[in-house]
Amino acid sequence: LDNIFRDIRPDAVKIGMVSSAALIKMIAEKLKEYHADNIVVDPVMVATSGAKLIEDDAVSALKEYLLPMAAVLTPNIPETEVLSGTPVKTEKDMITAAKPISETYHCAVLCKGGHQLNDANDLLYRDGSCQWFYGKRIDNPNTHGTGCTLSSAIASNLAKGFSLDESVERAKQYISGALAATLDLGKGSGPMHHGFDLRSAFIEESTENVAKGNANQKTTGGQQ
C-alpha cells in the first residue's frame, strides 16, 4: 500500500474479502494515512448460499475500521441482513435494511438484490433517498464473482470521474454484458466474460482521451 500510494496514487480503492481482523485494521490505517478517495467496500462476510466466510472478530473489525471509511458499501442480501439486523425478503425490506446501514456508517449503500430476489434489481440508498437500478435476470450458470466484479467496476468508474449514480449504472451495464456473453470455462459455476467488450470500450475511451489531450496541447500552444 505504501508503494502504491507513493508512486501512482489511485483515484479509487476497492476492498473485497479480508479475513483477518489485524489486516483489516492495518488497511484502514493506511487508507486514513494517505487520505484515500472513493473507497468502495464490498463487505464480504456471507456467501449468497448463506455460508459464513470470515470469523466474528474480522466482522467486528470490518464494522469498526473499514465500513466508516467507505464512500459506498455493496452488500448482498445476507450481508445486508447481518449489517442491519433485519431480514430481507422483499424490495421493501431492502429499503428498510439499507437505511440504518447508511446512517450508521455515513455512506451510500448499494444493496444487491440479484441473488435472492426475482430480478437483478439493486437499491442505492444515501442521504435518505432511494434509487433503483433495474436489470433482468440472465440465464447463465456462470455467475461466479459477479459481486466482486460489480464493486470493482463501480470503483473503476469513480476513478474515471463519473458520479456514483453513473458509476453504478455503467457497472450494471458491464455486468449484464459480461453475463450475456456466456463464457463457459471448466466445471461448475465459472466466471463471467470480463473481456466481452474490452476492445471497443478501450478504443472508445482512448479516442476520447487522445482528443482531449490534443485539445489541451493546442490550448497550451496557443497560450505560449
What residues fall within each predicted segment?
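Short, charged, surface-exposed loops that flank catalytic or proteolytic processing sites
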Residues: 87-94, 159-169
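Glycine-rich beta-alpha junction loops
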Residues: 19, 45, 79, 114-117, ...
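Short pre-catalytic strand/loop immediately N-terminal to key active-site residues, enriched for Gly-Thr
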Residues: 130-144
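Charged C-terminal helix
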Residues: 165-224
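Conserved N-terminal subdomain of the carbohydrate kinase-like
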Residues: 1-48, 52, 200
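Conserved phosphate/ATP/ADP-binding segment of small-molecule kinases
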Residues: 56-130
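Short, small-residue alpha-helix embedded
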Residues: 81-82, 140-164
